[in-house]
């Protein structure tokens, strides 16, 4: 299976980032505007601090009746996250997601943040490979329907 960096190279190099001092309300606005369900939390030096997901907001803020305007991202972000190394395969990332029940895996190389692989990225990659296989087979197969 492909190396995880190959999958990252197919994604936009733009990261959906937010400051830990931003409000949850700001995070929701950013998620909505960028059409994403997670944000990468970084400090002023662009150092990766954690992830904030729509699930985090729902469970830790909304369902806990906390204020969206006064609660900060740093209070709700997830810092205990499984991470992948740049040398890991896509299959390794799938196993991490399954083991820890997460939809995203941050990828690092020598402590440098490279990006995030999502379960959607992996699914799109699998469908792409599957489509290539079926395209070749479909050209060699004739189908007859009988009623």
For the regions a language model picked out, list residue spans one by one.
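Tandem CBS (Cystathionine beta-synthase) repeat/Bateman regulatory domains
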Residues: 1-147
